[in-house]
């Protein structure tokens, strides 16, 4: 019995190899990692070599000083990741010191989140230390995420040769030159995410030859900004929350294979659609106003389309036809329907709406290569037998339309 008690209370974790201990501790909050130093002599210095660090401030006035003291004791020469999240206002000098420490430790993934502002203004934003980025002394940084009250002022071109992913979330730019100098100094950039919010800049230019994935979300609520995209290597494009799609100008994207369009209220300028000629996968989140026109434009602009996904999780009663308006079929059947479309998915299909029934019938009637079609609809209560039977009739009709043109796998789901 005594031997069993000793076995159950044995400190077997401390017997692990130090490299494995460090690996385990890298997944824990940094505050917890430091607390392990009091467990035993063996644990006293293990935390000093952990390479994944995350510091979160909850309005702690001495937070910056605490982080400085931590790094004075921390011994790891390289950092895999450093995540700094501030809830209290931070001076530009403090931000510069912290970023300088990160660069000196050859950080690979850096996250800075200064979410302390009460209003969206450059006056309370801390300036990112641009001087640390203009020299060829940072060869390890691969991912950079900047959020909220950070002012990006780059009077000179940066030198971030290893940066592959950049995420800019509601930050402030000191003019279009700062945007240009930042993006032009990232020759290895592959993935760019830009989420803008009431930023007063007429033109936002994204000219990155190496860029493969681009996500743009604009929450400006009509403030207006024109996006100019020049990315000849672009393969994936995600556009969200544009009030007007004609505010996005794509100059060159011959490699584009997948595109997603979400919450776009209107489309007038067809320029952006010219870049979809090579797209094979297209996903559209249906918006309240004339969504069928957007779909028609997309189908006509994507002759090589193989996968089409339509999504309307809101199932809004305001979406679709207004009085006196109706969907107008394309003059000619789009090439993608005639030769290439293999998968058609409609999530949130409103089978009771005339416009949606017309669109579904048109697509199924004109596809010749369709292999699978999936329609997800809102569930119906069992007591509503008449409604249930009517829906089944509509869905059976759609299935027969598809099978009349080609053998397909039809799936009907409730969401």
Curated annotation (Swiss-Prot):
LRR repeats: 60-86, 87-114, 143-170, 171-196, 213-241
Keywords of this entry: Leucine-rich repeat, Repeat
SUPFAM superfamilies: F-box domain (SSF81383), RNI-like (SSF52047)
Record domain FBD: where: 272-377
Record-annotated F-box domain positions: 10-58
Stretches of the chain forming a coiled coil according to its record: none
Protein name: Putative F-box/FBD/LRR-repeat protein At3g49040
Organism: Arabidopsis thaliana
């Amino acid at each position: 019995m005594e031997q069993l008690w000793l076995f159950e209370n044995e400190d077997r974790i401390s017997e692990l190899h130090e490299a494995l201990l460090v690996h385990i501790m890298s997944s824990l909050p940094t505050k917890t990692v430091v607390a392990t130093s009091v467990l035993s002599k063996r644990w006293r210095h293990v935390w000093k070599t952990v390479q994944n660090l995350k510091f979160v401030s909850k309005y702690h006035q001495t937070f910056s000083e605490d982080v400085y003291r931590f790094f004075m004791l921390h011994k790891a020469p390289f950092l895999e990741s450093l995540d700094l999240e501030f809830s209290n206002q931070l001076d530009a000098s403090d931000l510069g010191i912290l970023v300088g420490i990160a660069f000196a430790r050859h950080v690979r993934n850096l996250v800075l989140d200064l979410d302390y502002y009460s209003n969206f203004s450059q006056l309370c934003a801390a300036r990112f230390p641009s001087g640390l980025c203009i020299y060829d002394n940072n060869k390890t940084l691969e991912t950079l995420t900047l959020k909220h009250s950070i002012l990006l002022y780059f009077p000179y071109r940066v030198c971030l040769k290893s940066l592959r992913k950049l995420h800019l979330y509601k930050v402030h730019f000191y003019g279009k030159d700062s945007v240009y100098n930042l993006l032009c100094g990232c020759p290895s950039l592959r993935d760019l995410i830009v989420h803008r919010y009431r930023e007063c800049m007429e033109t936002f230019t994204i000219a990155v030859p190496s860029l493969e994935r681009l996500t743009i979300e604009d929450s400006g609520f009509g403030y207006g900004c024109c996006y100019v995209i020049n990315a000849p290597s672009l393969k994936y494009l995600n556009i969200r929350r544009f009030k007007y799609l004609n505010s996005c100008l794509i100059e060159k994207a011959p490699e584009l294979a997948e595109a997603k369009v979400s919450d776009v209220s209107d489309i007038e300028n067809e320029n952006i659609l010219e870049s979809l000629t090579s797209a094979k996968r297209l996903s559209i989140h249906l918006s309240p106003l004339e969504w069928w026109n957007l779909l028609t434009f997309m189908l006509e602009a994507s002759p090589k389309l193989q996968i089409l996904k339509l999504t309307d999780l809101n199932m809004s009663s305001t979406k679709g036809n207004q009085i006196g308006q109706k969907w107008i079929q394309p003059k000619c059947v789009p090439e993608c329907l005639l030769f290439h479309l293999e998968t058609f998915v409609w999530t949130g299909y409103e089978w009771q709406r005339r416009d949606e029934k017309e669109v579904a019938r048109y697509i199924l009637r004109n596809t010749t290569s369709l292999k699978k079609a999936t329609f997800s609809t809102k569930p119906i209560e069992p007591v509503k037998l008449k409604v249930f039977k009517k829906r089944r009739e509509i869905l059976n009709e759609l299935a027969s339309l598809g099978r009349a043109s080609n053998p397909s796998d039809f799936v009907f789901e409730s969401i």
